[in-house]
């Protein structure tokens, strides 16, 4: 998705989705979730128990009787799981219009990490202060973006190698963000601001992150023909900087590398055997969303041969859907091929025109189900959306229900217990959230209650905001934020991470 590279304007933000009405949450006192089937997030087998919540914590698990005046949630026939934790989310600006984060909580997300792909709010402290005043419905963790600090230092002159003094200044900004509570450093090395950076520049900033116990999360430099070189670069950065690595939305996005997920797995597992703490996340769709310029990795957007190769690599202009184009609003919702036919031109002509006129956001259907399956079946790959509030891609509203409904119930790629681990305790541990991600006494009461026979996504490429089915209740910090599909009062927290060493 398009990297946010400028200081976020927190007052005069354009609307993304309409504000949502709320319903009042339950009165003070304990809550009993009765009769449900518990999947605790650890990967352990399910069991039928009751759960008592008092305040923002889980207090008891077992066969429990209601207390006088206690609110009881009937979970019979339902799965009770830890709230889903989205390690890769682009809701930074969406909270301005929809602090209830309806599209997020309705799919069971209780904690999300913003600032991926190299773009983040800055300063982090100012953003956190602003966000607290919005009273978000979900808990929020933040990464500091490499492209954000790079452009703050280099301005518009970013299309070159940074000098030593510029890298030193970037390092100061990364340290500032880590002290203000960032969980790690993110990069978007495929994007315009991050792409000119050398590996050595990123290593220098990652070393600063490592001093604070942070992690390195990367949208790697290439997800097409040079994907394997890009994965090796991420491994090198982790080794030389001495910190954990998270590969964002692991994928093989062009025809030339389709069905090579097994080779990627062998590369990553070799690094893991060598002692590197490297993991990845994956979203459950065969279409990616980004800026149109990534279709031509060489950045030779005025070279017809280079543009044609870029389009051929994703199966042609019919696979490239325009989702946001400020210079040509009439192009939105159409493919390059459709636009070209209407104008009696070629898809190459349309691409070059759009780039000349300022670019666009696109959804490109160019991944294989076989590769997605291979990635999801690795124990070191978690579920993440790469979505966010108002996202013009179905993953923004449907990621977690899609995994549960399509990949667990229908295709049986994963057990329900393993899928929930990939959505809860696994990302929690990656983010250093010690009291979230598991259902056990003393943990924060972030929970989701869903119908395992009905849960499924409904969002599509043409209707990306459709709400999923089957998510009945969502609790954040002990308060009900979703009850039978209605969004209730917000109760999220800002999870400042600080120094984790």
What is the meaning of each model-derived region?
Residues 75-80, 84-89, 96-187, 206, ...:
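Divalent-metal coordination cores built from histidine and acidic residues
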Residues 19-49, 53-54, 63-64, 105, ...:
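Active-site microenvironment of metallo-dependent hydrolases
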Residues 123, 195-202:
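Active-site-adjacent beta->alpha loops and helix N-cap segments on the catalytic face
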């Amino acid at each position: 998705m398009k990297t946010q590279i400028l200081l976020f304007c927190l007052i005069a933000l354009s609307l993304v989705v309409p504000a949502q009405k709320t319903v009042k949450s339950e009165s003070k006192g304990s809550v009993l979730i009765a009769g449900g089937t518990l999947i605790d997030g650890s990967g352990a087998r399910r069991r039928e128990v009751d759960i008592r919540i008092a305040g923002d914590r889980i207090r008891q698990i077992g066969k429990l009787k209601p207390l006088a005046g206690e609110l009881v949630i009937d979970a019979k026939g339902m799965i009770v799981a830890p709230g889903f934790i989205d390690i890769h989310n682009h809701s930074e600006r969406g909270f301005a219009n929809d602090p209830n984060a309806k599209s997020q909580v309705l799919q069971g997300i209780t904690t999300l990490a913003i600032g991926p792909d190299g773009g983040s709010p800055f300063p982090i402290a100012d953003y956190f202060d602003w966000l607290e005043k919005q009273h978000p419905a979900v808990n929020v963790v933040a990464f500091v973006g490499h492209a954000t600090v790079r452009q703050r230092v280099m301005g518009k002159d970013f299309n070159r190698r940074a000098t030593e003094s510029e890298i030193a200044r970037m390092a100061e900004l990364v340290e500032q963000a880590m002290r203000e509570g960032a969980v790690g450093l993110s990069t978007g090395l495929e994007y315009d601001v991050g792409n000119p950076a050398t590996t050595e520049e990123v290593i220098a900033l990652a070393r600063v992150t490592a001093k604070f116990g942070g992690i390195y999360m990367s949208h790697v430099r290439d997800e097409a023909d040079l994907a394997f070189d890009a994965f090796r670069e991420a491994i090198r950065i982790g080794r030389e900087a001495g910190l954990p690595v998270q590969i964002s939305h692991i994928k093989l996005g062009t025809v030339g590398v389709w069905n090579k997920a097994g080779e990627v797995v062998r590369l990553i597992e070799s690094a893991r055997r060598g002692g590197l703490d490297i993991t990845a996340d994956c979203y459950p769709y065969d279409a990616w969303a980004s800026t149109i310029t990534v279709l031509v990795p060489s950045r030779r957007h005025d070279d017809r041969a280079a543009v044609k190769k870029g389009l051929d690599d994703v199966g042609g202009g019919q696979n490239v859907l325009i989702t946001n184009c400020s210079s040509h609003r009439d192009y939105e919702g159409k493919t390059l091929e459709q636009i070209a036919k209407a104008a009696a031109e070629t898809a190459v002509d349309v691409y070059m025109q759009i780039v000349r006129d300022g670019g666009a956001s696109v959804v490109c259907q160019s991944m294989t189900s076989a590769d997605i399956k291979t990635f999801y079946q690795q124990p070191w790959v978690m579920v993440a959306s790469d979505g966010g509030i108002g996202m013009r891609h179905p993953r923004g509203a449907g990621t977690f229900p899609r995994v549960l409904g399509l990949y667990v119930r229908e295709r049986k790629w994963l057990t329900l217990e393993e899928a929930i681990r990939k959505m809860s305790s696994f990302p929690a541990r990656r983010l250093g959230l010690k009291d979230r991600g598991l259902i056990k006494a003393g943990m924060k009461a972030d929970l989701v209650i869903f119908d395992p026979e009905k849960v499924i996504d409904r969002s599509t490429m043409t209707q990306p905001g459709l709400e999923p089915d089957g998510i009945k209740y969502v609790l954040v910090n002990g308060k009900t934020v979703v009850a039978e599909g209605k969004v209730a009062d917000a109760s999220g927290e800002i999870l400042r991470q600080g120094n984790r060493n």
